[in-house]
Amino acid sequence: MDLRELTQHDVATMWSINEQGLPGTGQVSKQEMADLLNFSVLSLGVFREQELLGFVICLPPGTRYGSLNYAWFNQRFEAFMYVDRIAVAQQHRDQGIGSMLYEQVIASSDEQGVPVAAEVNSTPPNPGSMRFHERFRFKEVGELHHQEKSVMMLLRT
């Protein structure tokens, strides 16, 4: 498996993988996925030959991204690397791909001297994602309630 930066050529496959992770990943259109890639400070994919197996998109503070979760971090922290989404193709889960991606995110944030920001659904609950983030020493720093769901806001310093 190889890690590489994502490009606009990867958007259709990224979108498909993202759809497999709903509702945990949050639904976006292909155009919104392309926009996220343009906003990103870090966008990595894990590939086996030419097949995209999983990806992560991280945003810096201050972009035009309209997510309420992202805005929550923007209002409270000056510097961070926001994990907007991490997704692994259904048939490739439980193979360490998510961990491989997060290790790169953490290494990049450590190089920049900024914390990693993320959120996990609390309603409906996503216990697998919470355990995953706890393994990487994320701590809860708040909770945000939306109409149909709530999310725990996490930070890794």
Feature names for model-found ranges:
Residues 1-14:
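A short beta-loop-alpha structural element at the N-terminal edge
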Residues 42-60:
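Conserved beta-hairpin
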Residues 57-85:
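Conserved acyl-donor/pantetheine-binding loop and adjacent beta-alpha core of acyl/acetyltransferases
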Residues 84-93, 122-123:
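A short, internal acetyl-CoA/4′-phosphopantetheine-binding micro-motif in the GNAT/acyltransferase core
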Residues 88, 94-107, 131, 135:
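Conserved acetyl-CoA-binding loop-helix of GNAT-fold acetyltransferases
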Residues 99, 122-142:
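Conserved active-site alpha-helix within GNAT-family acetyltransferase domains
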Residues 109-122:
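Conserved GNAT acetyl-CoA-binding A-motif
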Residues 143-157:
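C-terminal "cap" of GNAT-fold acetyltransferases
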